[in-house]
Structure formats: C-alpha cells, structure tokens
Amino acid sequence: MRPSHPSPITLTTDDSGFLRNGRPHQIVSAAIHYFRVHPDLWSDRLERLRAMGVNTVETYVAWNVHEPRPGEFSFDGAEDLAAFVRLAGDLGLDVIVRPGPYICAEWDFGGLPGWLLADRTIRLRRTDARYLAAVDAWFDVLVPVLAPLLGSRGGPVVAMGVENEYGSFGNDTAYLEHLRDGLLARGVDCLLFTTDGAGHGFQLGGRIPGVLTTGTFGSRPEASLATMRVYQPKGPLVCVEYWHGWFDHWGEHHHTRDPQDATAMLDSLLAAGASVNIYMGHGGTNFGWWNGANHDGATYQPDITSYDYDAPVGEAGELTAKFHLFREVITRHTGPVAHEAPALPPRQAPRTLALDGHVSLTDSLDLLSTTQHHVDPVTMEEAGQSLGLIHYRTRLRGPLPKAELRIDGLADRAQVFLDGREIGLLERDRPLAALDVTVPDGGARLDVLVENQGRINYGPLLADRKGIRDGVRLDNQYQFGWEVRPLPLDDLTALTFTSAPVTDGPAFHRTVVQVDTPADAFIELPGWTKGMVWLNGFALGRYWERGPQKTLYAPGPLWKAGTNTLIVLELHTPGTTVEIRDTSEPRRTHPSPSGRRQAPGRNVDDAAPFAVGLRHADDRGRPPPARATETQHATRVRHGSRQHACLELGLLATRGSETSRSQTRSRGLDR
C-alpha cells in the first residue's frame, strides 16, 4: 500500500536500464483495461495481478468511451479513469497510461470516437487539421484528469505512451511530434515512450527523438530484443506488449497458448534484463457493442464479446495455469511476492429461465428512435450515431416483376424486408450479392436493418463508416427518399412487452429472475441465433451461434437482490429458454465452426494452439508460399488491405523450429 501522503516517483533511464527514484529497476507489468472491467471489480482484478508478482499495471485510455459525442465528456462510474489509477496506486502498483489517441486494443475504431467519421474528408492518424483539432480538444480535457496522478506529484503514473504502434500504419513524424509536444505542453513530465512491432519497418515509422523506443512481440525474444537494440542503442529494452495469448473472431476457435511455452518466453525476457508488460494480465469483456474488428483485405473479421485473451487472470477472475507459472518466474527474477490473490467471487447456481414477454423491433421503432429524413441512406456517423443498429425505410415504386436489389457500401450486415417479410441477408464480405425483388402494382415498403458489428481497429481500413455508405439500387437505379432511424439501444425502458410470442425476425424477448444474493453468472442462449443481451439495462454483449463464444459473462455487481430482468434482442430465430450457468462452459456440446464436434468450453484447440491457417511474411509483409505443417505459436496480427501491416509473429513448425513473420489468411464466415 502507498502511504497516505506518498513521495514523488521518478522513472528515468541510464545507459543500462530504468532507474526508479535513482535505483535500478526492472518493470514487470500486466495489462488491464478499466473499460473492460466492471468498476466494482477493479480492486479484485488489480489485487489478483499484484498477487502474480507484477510491480506495475498498464492501461490504454479509450477516447470513444469518454467522449461519445463531440464535447460531451464522462469520467464517472465505469469511465472514472482517475479512480482506477488511484486504486492501483493504493495497492502499491505503478501505472503506465497509454492515452493514444489511437489505441488499437481490439476495441471499436481503435478507441477513436465514431463521430470523427461524420466528416467524410477527415484523415486519421496524420497531420490533418480536423483530426488534430479533435485530438487537441480531447487532450485538453484528458491531461488535467491525469496530471495530478503523475509520479512527480505523488501519484502512481510513471510513464505514458505516444500514439500506439504507429509504424504499422504510417510514418508522419510531424504527427507524432505534435502528440509528444502536446503532452509536454500540458504538463506531462513523466517518461514518454513509443511502441512498435519488433521489425525494422515498424520501428523506422514509429519512433521519434527524445522518446524511449519500445517493442511489441510474442515470440523469438532474442531476435526481437536484438532488433530493438538497433533502435534503442542504450538504455532499457522494453516489451510493452508481450503477447502470450490472443483474441478471437466470430467463426474461429478460441485461441490458447501452452502455458509452459508462454512462461518460458517470459523467463527469457526477464533473464535478458528486459522490462515486460504482460498483454493481457486480465483481458475482461467487450461489453455492449464495443468490440473491434480486423480486415485481411478479403474478409471482415469482427471480434467476439469476450476478451479473455487466454490471460493469467481469466475473464471472470479465474487464476489460470499461466497465473501460477508466471508468478513462479517473476518471483525467481524479482523476489518473493508479498500478497495472495483474493478468493474467487461466488457464482450463481445454474437454472433455466422461461420467457415471459416479447415485442418485435419493427413495432418498437418509434419508441426507440427519432426518425430522420434523408435523400440518401446516410451512414450511422452522419446520423449522429456510433454504435448499435440502424434502420432504413423507403417506398419502392411498382409494378416491377423482377429486379435485383443491391446495397453499395454495406457495413456490416443487413436484413432486408419487403412489406414486413424478410427476403434475405446481405453482408459486407459479399459486396456484389443481390436479392431478387418483385414489387406489386401499388408499390412496396422496403426496410433495411443494418448491424454495426464493430469498427476495424487496425490497418489501412481504419475509417470504417457504418450503415449504408453509398446507396441502395434496384438493378442500376438508386432509390432515394429515406426514413432513417438510429438504434443505439442504450435505453430499452420504453419497450412494451406482451405474452404473445414472436417466433421470427428481429424482436426483444424478456425473462425475469429472482436472485437472493447477487453473484457472478454466465448467460447461455441454447437454440438462439444472433443478437444482444441486456441485464437490468446493462448491455452484456453480443452472442452468435457461429461461436466460439457460447456464454456471456454477467458480473455479480450487475445483479441485484430481488427481481432482475434479462432482455434478449434476437435478430433471427429465438430459442425458448435462457440458461444461467456457473461456468463459461455451455451445458451441451456445440458444433465447432468447422463442423467438427468439440468438448464443451472455450479452450477448444489445446492440441494445436492458435491454429488459424497462417503463412509467413517478411518485414515488408511479402508472403512466401504457405506451408501446411505449421501452427501458430504466438501471434498478434491486425489486418489491413493493400498493405500488409503485420506485427511480429512467431510460428512453430512441426519440427519445433521458429519461423519468421506471418499474417492470417482470409477466413470465410458463413451465417
């Protein structure tokens, strides 16, 4: 614990490494994102990380969480960044803060606010007057929140990042210097650093004078550190993101990495004298609509709700094998750990819940949204919306015996209805797909419901506007004159439920459950297809029969003693019950995305961890022929098209030797 009146902390560097208050210091840190953890559980998760032996925690700052609309800022409750940092400091932990403004993080739009994209001419992450004006206005608010927490003022913040992995995107040094100078001018006096993949191209694009150069990688520690030493000839070697785990896209297996292998690399880094940030220490959850997405040039790849990341502290606070092995290694290098982890929070007993209320989304449109009128079907951002669904309606003229309906610039997934009947599904990965339409003499009402499945958070396709970007055509004729209804679905209190079942199409379904003592639980939806779940008004996240995720984590603080309400928005066909589980494992075995059967739970591919179909790429992303004998070993790829902005990857060939960089191949996703 820190004293009630702590002394200033200084983190500096000399030729050999870090100095903390003048003494040699090795940073052993764990990443935890406050915006992925319920605030009532911040202390629990931080205590678990402290018990693993780390002396520091690291967090990104998600701009879009704090400024959901231009000029409207929130730093209360789940957005109380200062409270999170103070709490870490009270537990005796130093804090590294990475304010971006771009953070990647598998978070919607890499943490940038969606409203930036309302201006179709804005240019992101470079010296663009409109973008920099928004960033400067944000930093004018953010830095005063963080300044009192700096180590020089007795707070726990010892270092801050400048942008994030910028060399994987661009090389505008003037932009990075603008961010650096902006932090300094606003009073940030702690150590500053940039971080990029441990490849020459990345480092050349992302480093700037006067700022510590650090790396991100998950394999080949000796080679990675050697590359880092080229760009940081003296001073500390730092792996700001040690990728011991990985995130998941819908339709993939859950990614895991052998704990012994992950521990061996951590041991190698610490033995080399490097400072390390374990990414992630605790992954948490992409609650609500906040998940990010990748794009590999051919396939859009949205992330699942869980951000478990195969971390040492699991999504619900579990202490995994990695936790215990990492603790042993950290203890060996830095000394005994003085703290033990708290007991695992209690969990609710399993039960099956019947539905007691239903209402269709179409019948609720006017209760959930205010209608806008536009000539063209504008994007979400142009309609003043960032997250959720958006509904478009127009009147088609008839008679038209046969026509093909196309959506130009769809992002991401559209259900199409003619006079209230669903006629098909369109997705962004099939931009040339069309639906056959017959319009009767009197015309027909066309409804299009589009889901934003998560903005791309990495690569050249970052400007990922949602909804309908260009237009809707019948054959070659664009349709004009649209009613547009933004559906952020952040308040469902106006819904009017009835007992009459709604068995098909987008609809809300309700169940009520009595709870004696609030506790953690997992929500399973057997027989349901795709949608979103709310608990007592809080959006838990998306579900999708595609997997790999089969349950949603419902933290104990969201429950209350007495009556609790679960609302499920099902976009297609609902199940008949909702299951409360005491484990993330579903009640029954589900088909894997490939059609094979797999054991229940989310560690579905332990025999071949990270096997997602890879090929190698050199430093410039040029892929040689694929080799079918390799499985992924330790990866972190955020994809882009027209340029391969791959980060450092490691593969293990079946003979056990490591290979060079790689990138994930396109993975087609069925419905």
Residue ranges and their predicted role:
Residues I27-H38, W63-E79, L117-A137, G161-D172, ...:
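The substrate-binding groove and active-site-proximal loops of carbohydrate-active enzymes
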Residues S43-W107, R180, L184:
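Aromatic-lined substrate-binding rim segments of carbohydrate-active enzymes
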Residues G71-G77, P101-R125, L176, G210-T213, ...:
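Aromatic- and acidic-residue-enriched segments that line the glycan-binding/catalytic groove
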Residues L81-L91, V95-V97, T121-P156:
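An active-site-proximal structural segment forming one wall of the substrate-binding cleft
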Residues A133-I208:
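Active-site neighborhood of glycoside hydrolase catalytic domains
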Residues G218-G314, E318, V329:
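Catalytic-core region of carbohydrate-active enzymes that cleave or remodel glycosidic bonds
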Residues K402-F417, L446, V513-N536, Y543-W544, ...:
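Aromatic-lined ligand-binding clefts that engage carbohydrates, nucleic acids, or primary amines
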